[in-house]
């Protein structure tokens, strides 16, 4: 058993550790949570079905083989419409809240303008989640109970991996609605299956993006890079290639594995999960090769 750092034992998180971490890879799923607090549902102006459309449903299941391959897997249990862990902590719309606000707020981002800050203002349909303004105390409560435990744990996993192997690759796992799968294409009739986000090459070494793209394309899937999703807070915070810390975001078209209208798994979900298992094996090999510490030069 590896001596992993002491990790927060928190009901908001599902952290699955391998018996022995054998590769410098960590997998994270920030948006697959579906534990809706009853008080949140009472506040909501939209039905649960509308809130669930924001979930990256079943993504944690697709990547569930990670621990058996020697990789830690972290998944949020809280839903994205409650707290978005792929946002800055104070990336918020001040107009949502009643009462004193923390300073400074980062309220000028395109994501906040779209209603999709750390505490989202709108559901996936564009409908307002809340009937009116909500107490500003909500901000610190949700940071303390969800956002901070998630990122404290993720940071510990990444740093443990770095200290053990001399480098770390974080795979940030997501899914996208099929309606978004043509947004980055010239031909709107051409569906994209996978979008790889490396923050326009700033979040990971090109070898990682290329390896994932080759893997998916070899299996007949259509792949784009950084369009329409280049990555969010996670790629920006954890992607530091110059410091041997790399992050690659993977967006999967939900139509490949689920019935979006019914919010149910398709019969083919197991087949697709096995494909993802193969991808993780390939990325593990690539990480070992790319992050191999340089050997000292022999003395002359």
Model feature map: region roles:
Residues 1-170, 175-248, 252-300:
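N-terminal catalytic or cofactor-binding beta/alpha core of small enzyme domains
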């Amino acid at each position: 058993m590896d001596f992993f750092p002491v990790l927060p034992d928190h009901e908001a998180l599902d952290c699955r550790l391998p018996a022995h971490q054998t590769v410098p890879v960590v997998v994270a799923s920030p948006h697959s949570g579906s534990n809706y607090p009853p008080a949140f549902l009472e506040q909501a102006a939209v039905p649960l079905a509308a809130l669930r459309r924001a979930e990256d449903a079943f993504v944690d299941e697709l990547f569930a083989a990670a621990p058996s391959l020697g990789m830690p897997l972290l998944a949020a249990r809280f839903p994205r419409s409650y707290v978005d862990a792929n946002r800055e902590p104070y990336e918020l719309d001040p107009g949502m809240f009643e009462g004193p606000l923390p300073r400074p707020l980062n309220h000028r981002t395109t994501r906040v303008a779209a209603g999709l800050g750390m505490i989202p203002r709108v559901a996936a349909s564009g409908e307002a989640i809340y009937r009116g303004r909500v107490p500003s105390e909500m901000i610190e409560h949700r940071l303390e109970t969800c956002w901070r435990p998630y990122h404290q744990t993720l940071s510990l996993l990444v740093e443990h991996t770095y200290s053990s192997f001399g480098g770390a690759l974080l795979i940030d796992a997501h899914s996208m609605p099929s309606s978004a799968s043509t947004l980055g294409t010239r031909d709107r009739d051409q569906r994209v299956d996978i979008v790889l986000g490396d923050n326009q090459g700033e979040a990971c070494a090109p070898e990682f993006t290329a390896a994932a793209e080759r893997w998916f394309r070899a299996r007949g899937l259509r792949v784009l890079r950084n369009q329409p999703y280049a990555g969010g807070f996670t790629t920006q915070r954890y992607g530091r290639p110059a410091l041997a810390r790399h992050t690659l975001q993977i967006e999967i078209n939900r139509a490949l594995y689920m019935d979006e209208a019914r919010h149910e798994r398709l019969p083919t979900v197991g087949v697709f999960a096995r494909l993802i298992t193969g991808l993780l094996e390939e990325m593990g090999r690539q990480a070992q090769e790319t992050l191999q510490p340089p050997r000292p030069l022999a003395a002359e």
